[in-house]
Amino acid sequence: MAYDMMEADGGTVEREDHNPTPRVELHLHTVMSDMDALITVKQLIKTIKKWGHPAVAVTDHGVVQSFPLLQEISTDKTNNVKVIYGMEGYLFDDKIDQSYHIIILAKNQIGIRNLYKLVSISHLKYIYRGRPRIPRAVLSEYREGLILGSACEAGELVRSMVQKKLPYEELKKIASFYDYLEIQPLTNNGFLVREGFVADEEGLRDINRTILKLSDDLGKLTVATCDAHFMNPEDKIYREILMTGKGFKDAEFQPDLYLRTTDEMLAEFAYLGEERAREVVITNPNKINDMIDDCRPVPKETLYFPQIAGSSEALKNMCYKKAHEIY
């Protein structure tokens, strides 16, 4: 029980994005990523509008529950922000206990429909230890209208590179499945050094360099993403609390998973050289944004409710029966 309370100075510094060619974030989690992220829809749209970013992708873990509110707020005349509707899914092949993160973005209304199908199928048929997983064959079946990204360190590509130590030609085969590849700030993967998977920060840079080489060899785009879970740098203490509550022993070592401005992101990838950094931070994410329509996750005209044979008569009979029991 709290015996006293006092207002604390949150210390939040209002950041601005003054870059004349702003970036697009393609990997971001809202509070709908259960017990994992802290960004609210209102906070996100307000920030994206203020920073002048052309669009933002929302990719919550295994769910699309943020979509209705995202559509409502982003399409308001006072905001008019483009949202790229997506999800971070759990991809698996034949091993029941092994799945990989994958970013799935809806390119158009067909993609929205197929994304919904994947959400339904993964929750109804392939839940394993709380994770709604998507078989690769099912994803391929419903791939129309979707853009697939290789995701984070928990994705198939980085896991195969860092933990399985697969040779380069095998990595090329894996990378060829995806429409674009993803690299992230070094802080996101700092635990790989802490746990001995790579020797030092230079090893983390080499992971990103290898992904870039793969994209060059395969003719694919590589994009730099934040994998944002909270809005500002100082917010990571709150995610530490969430992770501690979930039992993570390394919760105190929180990576800086905050949403970065364009210049902040360019600084993160300065080791690639100015031209290459601009390519992955600004040019390529904007190219992917240009491929994507302004989608409506909730239809404007009507909703398509399920048709269950005999349901109207059954409901009527149930109501009359209950009424007779009560009265």
Where are these regions (language model features)?
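A short acidic, often aromatic-flanked loop/helix-cap motif at beta-alpha or helix-coil junctions
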Residues: 89-94, 112, 156-157, 188-190
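A residue-level signal for conserved active-site and pocket-lining positions in enzyme catalytic cores
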Residues: 27, 60, 83, 108, ...
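Hydrophobic alpha-helical scaffolding
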Residues: 34, 105, 197-204, 252-259, ...
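Metal-dependent DNA phosphodiester-chemistry modules and their immediately adjacent helices/loops
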Residues: 94-95, 105-132, 250-267
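Phosphate/diphosphate-binding loops
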Residues: 82-93, 98-101, 211-217, 230-235, ...
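Non-catalytic structural connector segments
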Residues: 3-22, 26, 275-327
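Residues in well-ordered beta-strands of folded domains
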Residues: 84, 90, 103-106, 149-150, ...
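Domain-core and long-helix interface of multi-subunit machines
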Residues: 9-58, 62-78, 117, 121-235, ...
